[in-house]
Amino acid sequence: MEITLGIAMFTVIVLALAVIILFAKSKLVNSGDITIEINDDPSKAIHLPAGGKLLGALASQGIFVSSACGGGGSCGQCIVKVTEGGGDILPTELSHISKREAKEGYRLSCQVNVKNSMKVELPEEVFGVKKWECTVISNDNKATFIKELKLAIPEGEEVPFRAGGYIQIEAEPHTVAYKDFDIPEEYHEDWDKYNLWRYVSKVDEHIIRAYSMASYPEEKGIIMLNVRIATPPPNNPDAPPGQMSSYIWSLKAGDKVTISGPFGEFFAKETDAEMVFVGGGAGMAPMRSHIFDQLKRLKSKRKMSFWYGARSKREMFYVEDFDTLQAENDNFVWHVALSDPQPGDNWDGYTGFIHNVLYENYLKDHEAPEDCEYYMCGPPIMNASVIKMLKDLGVEDENILLDDFGG
């Protein structure tokens, strides 16, 4: 009898808990259809089932908001203005959104739960963003840890981007073994030294990452990226390798790749001011895009120089391209500084870190460095060093333009 009573009591408790959970869920999650009004324009309103995040909800309706981290909340790019609904701002958003912005309704769309109808404001350029399935033309090493991925846009289509812009690339769940990478023998030294062939990248979810374009608008029908493989650092060799860079390095000619875009704000100012470009590593991508666009498409006569930092001669690329531009344009010069030239390099050019080389060999004696516009993209330590040097020279923030990708 006691056993039967105990079982009955247990069953009642379980059923009561189930009812409470279902009731709470009904209050917390609206399972019906909701409406997201956009920019107070009835024609832009979307209707969809409740659930998920605002970033994904918009994407499901063909509205692609920039998100370099793929919705992880770390890049801070997917900011939108929520004027009604959306709940309270989350602590994870406050590292990217100021208190003033939060009061005005700004949110990270990847963190906003879609439970009820809401009203949002989006930049108009978002509605020009599209998605394409591209075909890999080539994926060749340009340096030890950098590949140039060249993609063909579907016939009859074009990506209407501006120089300095970027696209987002997608990947489904996958497993990539580094031992299967196609890497020319000349680049094997460091791969062997650090035994990088042992790594495997296993991804169990759909991922999205942003990459600056190396191509410029007149290179029709293609998108070109410079992608640095994100290997685990030597001081933490058991850390997982970069998910998207590993995926991209595994791609071969003929493979299909989904991209969306164009996005961007790292655009050249329309002035007559002197332009100084500073790059390093895969930060070459937007530098190439900008410089080619200025000299080849716009036929710009603005004074401009390009200062690129590399470790050794093996890490230099697009050398012939920039040599040709320099020969054809009196208003353009470019310089490379090697931080660790090898004995076999027979290097007689600049050596050291690029910010020091730029200062000692040009800006130190420049009559008005504060009047120049500085465009830069490279490893974080390079960016920080260049910015400090420019600040010390009195350059205002408005003349320092930084692309945080590509490095």
From Swiss-Prot:
Sequence segments annotated as region (Catalytic): 272-389
GO cellular component annotations of the record: plasma membrane
Pfam family, one: Fer2
Required cofactor names: [2Fe-2S] cluster; FAD
Domain 2Fe-2S ferredoxin-type as annotated: residue spans: 32-126
Keywords for the protein's UniProt record, in alphabetical order: 2Fe-2S, Cell inner membrane, Cell membrane, FAD, Flavoprotein, Ion transport, Iron, Iron-sulfur, Membrane, Metal-binding, NAD, Sodium, Sodium transport, Translocase, Transmembrane, Transmembrane helix, Transport, Ubiquinone
Positions annotated to bind [2Fe-2S] cluster: 69, 75, 78, 110
Any one GO molecular function term: 2 iron, 2 sulfur cluster binding
Presence of the UniProt keyword Nucleus in the record: no
Main location: membrane
Enzyme class: translocase
Record membrane topology: Single-pass membrane protein
Catalytic activity: a ubiquinone + n Na(+)(in) + NADH + H(+) = a ubiquinol + n Na(+)(out) + NAD(+)
InterPro entries, per the entry: 2Fe-2S_ferredoxin-like_sf (IPR036010), 2Fe-2S_ferredoxin-type (IPR001041), Beta-grasp_dom_sf (IPR012675), Cbr1-like_FAD-bd_dom (IPR008333), FAD-bd_FR_type (IPR017927), Flavoprot_Pyr_Nucl_cyt_Rdtase (IPR001709), FNR_nucleotide-bd (IPR039261), NqrF (IPR010205)
Annotated transmembrane regions: 3-23
BP terms from Gene Ontology: sodium ion transport
Domain FAD-binding FR-type: 129-269
Subunit composition and interactions: Composed of six subunits; NqrA, NqrB, NqrC, NqrD, NqrE and NqrF.
Physiological role: NQR complex catalyzes the reduction of ubiquinone-1 to ubiquinol by two successive reactions, coupled with the transport of Na(+) ions from the cytoplasm to the periplasm. The first step is catalyzed by NqrF, which accepts electrons from NADH and reduces ubiquinone-1 to ubisemiquinone by a one-electron transfer pathway.
The protein's name in its UniProt record: Na(+)-translocating NADH-quinone reductase subunit F
